Amino acid sequence: RAGVSIGGTSPLPLPVEIRSIDAYNPTLALMLEGNAIKWLGKTKKWGVITGVRLETKNMITKATVKNYGMEIIGNDGNRLKGNWTGGVKTKVRNAYITVPVLGAYKINSRLRAKAGIYVSYLMDEEFSGHVYEGYLREGDSTGEKVNFSDGAIATYDFSDDLRKFAWGVQAGVDWRAFKHLSVFADLTWGLNDIFKKDFNTITFAMYPIYLNVGFGYAF
């Protein structure tokens, strides 16, 4: 199976620190999977699906925030940590190897539904971006004010703080369009924070939520 992933990595619900989402670009995120199904019983209505999936989970967003936990990198390489108010651009580009374990139900000869869990290992990671048109309060919301205006930006990079193992739930449908060709749609919803437990710059958990759509060859 091959397809694309469309979605984002987001806190749920949106915290008060995020005042608005100003731009969103899912970018091109590809997935490739091989799986097998074992039908059970005489009627073969129920089955179990497992396999291996290579996938990327990407997005680029712009948001307006207030008192948003941040650690920026200055032009001199020094890091400033505190609360940011202003614009934030975020780029997420993560590559995983994923093993789903799903229960399947055959609705008819062409259509089947499936749901279950998945576990993923992060192979290549990026969570970075920059801040713009705003100010940083060093330390906390009452700290010294550092302004960024007139096109000035400061970068940040939390890639090394991403968790290597992830898990979540998955549900979707497969439709057999032709004898050997099927199309599919799967929703995957992460259930653990993408950041490591000891990472506290961003003060809320973030979860990957993506829709995979594509086609597959059935043997």
Language-model features: where?
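Transmembrane beta-barrel strands of outer-membrane/channel proteins
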Residues: 2-6, 50-56, 115-121, 185-189, ...
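Extracellular/periplasm-exposed beta-strand and loop segments of Gram-negative cell-envelope proteins
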Residues: 8-27, 57-95, 122-166, 192-210
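Outer-membrane beta-barrel architecture
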Residues: 31-37, 100-102, 172, 214-216
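Outer-membrane beta-barrel strand-turn architecture
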Residues: 38-42, 105-109, 177-179, 219
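Repeated loop/turn-to-beta-strand initiation elements of outer-membrane beta-barrel proteins
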Residues: 44-48, 110-113, 179-185
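A hydrophobic membrane-anchoring alpha-helix module
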Residues: 174-176, 180-192
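Outer-membrane beta-barrel "beta-signal"
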Residues: 175-180, 207-219
